[in-house]
Amino acid sequence: MPNPKMDALNENSTDPQIQEAISSEIEMCMKEPGAEQKACAGKAYGMAREKTGKELNYGQ
């Protein structure tokens, strides 16, 4: 299922927009059967990095 918040990200997106898109993507991913939080987070961060071109080291 497409995530409009993730789809809207680009190189001009702000940190709060990026964080919201990542959270939304993780939430959607976790609804899938057999989903694991670590895998969903990795997927979401990877998508956000690709869309924004930013390193995204939140929480480190």
Language-model region placement:
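C-terminal alpha-helical interaction appendages
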Residues: 1-60
